[in-house]
């Protein structure tokens, strides 16, 4: 103890004669991370947190991006339960998957997106890797572009786009640009603006497209509009990067929802594609997705696959196994696949029905506004056209929670609360 006391005294004396030593000691005592600032809260998670604190029995959370049944409860698809039971009965091991994921899952995902009779699938001029849901697919795709797309660093996003698109591409080293997409005056697709902007994008740039059920607007191009977009993309030699998070969940028909992707490929446009099974199989927490690159030939596909594996290895080595087994079991079992397609249609139909009921109830309330855009839009989300101050009133006066831009998750609307929602919207818009 005496020696320790002497050391402290000597240290104090040294500090008195050498101020630099005192500063160094102070620096050592402070945290390495004192300079780290508090980051902004996630806007959607913030909505959910505020909702949870609300004690109003009529409160509604229309911010969450997950399907709910007509009782407002999370829904596990019966086909998923059956697939899990089949997997459990096999007593399979939990060994690592290959870097690219479960092979049969990757093949089935490509066939689901491109069509079982697709020339691309038959010729093998594609590569599909399993990813950590749609977000992981986007990040792998963005990193692949950053490393190998030598023509441009610019990625053109529709305005608006899913909020996570920007940080995903930005953090991968790409630069973000935008093109017109949503028309706030009509609450619909700004086809003229989009086509004009896309036609001016520098050649050999990356164009991000939502394959169906555009998030956050719910506004999709019609097939004839997709055809014109594809013509411009081909003429301008743009690289089409498709995000397809809602196949089957938009219209209830998986082939219809994948129409744009397949049309582009038929026109000789070699796209890349991100898929997610969060929404259409309800596998939110399993993180099941896929990333596909369409190539010139099978040889090129093998080279691309090798580089995708090199990208994946230092990120997460290999993807999780359970969710991929569930999806693969459903997609490759004729009976389960048929059941799943019916369940997906049931979810899509419920959302479409809620859109119709909301408009009907708004009319019953006596609203004189046009709400046709609610039924014209498609998928889980709806851009209501509500202004920020109206959204604020909905929250304060009616305990109805949504993002400030007026986007609602129609999956959070039920036959039990649609009347209340219509009444509240009418009160803040009349």
Curated annotation (Swiss-Prot):
User: What does the entry list as the binding residues for substrate?
Assistant: 65, 162, 215, 407
Alphabetically sorted, this entry's keywords are: Acetylation, Aminotransferase, Cell membrane, Lipid transport, Membrane, Methylation, Mitochondrion, Nitration, Phosphoprotein, Pyridoxal phosphate, Transferase, Transit peptide, Transport
Q: Which residues carry this modification: N6-(pyridoxal phosphate)lysine?
A: 279
Carrying Asymmetric dimethylarginine, the residues are 313
What residues bear Phosphothreonine in this entry?
48
What does UniProt give as GO cellular component?
A: mitochondrial matrix; mitochondrion; plasma membrane
UniProt catalytic activity = L-aspartate + 2-oxoglutarate = oxaloacetate + L-glutamate; L-kynurenine + 2-oxoglutarate = kynurenate + L-glutamate + H2O
Q: Which residues carry this modification: 3'-nitrotyrosine?
A: 96
Q: Where is the transit peptide?
A: 1-29
Annotated Gene3D superfamilies: Aspartate Aminotransferase, domain 1 (3.90.1150.10), Type I PLP-dependent aspartate aminotransferase-like (Major domain) (3.40.640.10)
Miscellaneous notes for this chain? In eukaryotes there are cytoplasmic, mitochondrial and chloroplastic isozymes.
What is said about its interaction partners and assembly?
Homodimer.
Q: What does this protein do?
A: Catalyzes the irreversible transamination of the L-tryptophan metabolite L-kynurenine to form kynurenic acid (KA). As a member of the malate-aspartate shuttle, it has a key role in the intracellular NAD(H) redox balance. Is important for metabolite exchange between mitochondria and cytosol, and for amino acid metabolism. Facilitates cellular uptake of long-chain free fatty acids.
- Which protein is depicted? Aspartate aminotransferase, mitochondrial
The encoding gene is GOT2
